Amino acid sequence: MASTFSATTSSCNLSSSAAISSFPLAAGKRNANKVVLPRKNRNVKVSAMAKELHFNKDGSAIKKLQNGVNKLADLVGVTLGPKGRNVVLESKYGSPKIVNDGVTVAKEVELEDPVENIGAKLVRQAAAKTNDLAGDGTTTSVVLAQGLIAEGVKVVAAGANPVLITRGIEKTSKALVAELKKMSKEVEDSELADVAAVSAGNNHEVGNMIAEALSKVGRKGVVTLEEGKSAENSLYVVEGMQFDRGYISPYFVTDSEKMTVEFENCKLLLVDKKITNARDLINILEDAIRSGFPIVIIAEDIEQEALATLVVNKLRGSLKIAALKAPGFGERKSQYLDDIAILTGGTVIREEVGLTLDKADKEVLGNAAKVVLTKDTTTIVGDGSTQEAVNKRVSQIKNQIEAAEQEYEKEKLSERIAKLSGGVAVIQVGAQTETELKEKKLRVEDALNATKAAVEEGIVVGGGCTLLRLASKVDAIKDTLANDEEKVGADIVKRALSYPLKLIAKNAGVNGSVVSEKVLSSDNPKYGYNAATGKYEDLMAAGIIDPTKVVRCCLEHASSVAKTFLMSDCVVVEIKEPESAPVGNPMDNSGYGNI
């Protein structure tokens, strides 16, 4: 059942965007080498949009939502397992994408029916969240969410209370996460290659390369990916540093698909104070415009007026720039800035040593071969010219560790040494064509993320068998639940846990139900189905391994999405305005022949 009402929504132009639109083109040409300070614009646009309400009185709303879930899950599901297929995605510009990565496929899906589209978006959250936290397991999250929703809708349609059902799902999922941690084991160095290979679609070349990269920079070292110039993959290590600070504003992003800032051969301005006045930066910024080099500003903070100036000039295309807050706090922040200065050969602007921002010139800037910023992290790769200074700095910090008394202080100092001397391993992904390169890079990225997740929380048996084994723990968990309807929620989880293994088997051309029964017939927790070879064997010995963190995130996020879905009873969507007919040309004389 659907009904309509009007709702008013307002949208304000961002000050930076408004300021940009107020610059005449001629002025832009006259001031090509000048930094433009933004002008304020307080115009507000208000628009009204009618909404359509879909109530669930006859079950139609939930059915449509579930259709959207199934369409997305069926599409993403074809990529699951070692014998999963690829999905071809149309690209408006350039060649089509051929991908085997669940979250990339999920992001591209927009369904025509608005209610079905909401269902698809809802389950897409499970993939996106798993990707953000674990970097892999996105397809499994979607398939598991589909299973929980399918089983849940059946019992809710039969009259069960959705509130108690979802409470049972939540309690069971939490208990299963605790059981999962008991099944987990710490990953050995020899197993890292297997973890990466499984995630890369059974590609052992990629697995071995990632294991080699981690052996060179350490388990907690930084590994980045680049597009190679040849058809072969390659690995090299350069000195570099990574810390937990991302760009201040998303307007600095240079790659809108990955939401990252990437600069090569760029300069760094290091400021140990808050930047309050944009005019203090003009000398440095006009140097950057004239010389054409990208610049990254690392400061204690940047106030809104100064930030608006940077954003406006970046969006106008006159300046390649990004800004971020310095890592750490207080004295530790100053030490981090000094570390960055030594790595890049720059000078930290500090008033107490007689350096002021308004008098600074390009002599104080550091140099970096590459800088990559995400919303949460920054990676700085040096140009190799400061290795001697870096070694001296590391020796100084080691002396401080020996003198430090508190464990926390020693830990933080050791962290600084790792950032300075650990270096960055760079994997260059090679391929014959651009289409193959994009697909291959996504696989390697998944493999790298899976390996990092395995280092963090350990590993479990792969191939969907760990989730299937968890189902056998549900009966014991049911005894702790308060009432029968919560126990029904636990049964929903139990049935849904077999969905990923069944789909892996189906994609390998085998009956999923037969496979799951055969796996459960053995009491050996490592026994399972190897879809790559078609054999039943000890999966841990065969190298079929999943990171515990990935399996945990799949379970948590799929159950979270399923709870939200099953509690829904009404859907609100915008009514699409009909496209207006094109206005005819009043001077059209076509009816009178050619003139």
UniProtKB/Swiss-Prot annotation:
InterPro entries: Chaperonin_Cpn60_CS, Cpn60/GroEL, Cpn60/GroEL/TCP-1, GroEL-like_apical_dom_sf, GROEL-like_equatorial_sf, TCP-1-like_intermed_sf. CDD domains: GroEL (cd03344). One of its GO terms (biological process) is protein refolding. Signal peptide: none annotated. Keywords: ATP-binding, Chaperone, Chloroplast, Nucleotide-binding, Plastid, Transit peptide. It is found in: Plastid, Chloroplast. Its main location: plastid. One of its GO terms (molecular function) is ATP binding. GO terms for cellular component: chloroplast. PROSITE patterns: CHAPERONINS_CPN60 (PS00296). Residues 1-49 form a transit peptide. This protein shows ATPase activity. Belongs to the chaperonin (HSP60) family. This protein binds RuBisCO small and large subunits and is implicated in the assembly of the enzyme oligomer. HAMAP family: CH60 (MF_00600). Oligomer of probably six alpha and six beta subunits. This is RuBisCO large subunit-binding protein subunit beta, chloroplastic. It comes from Pisum sativum (Garden pea).
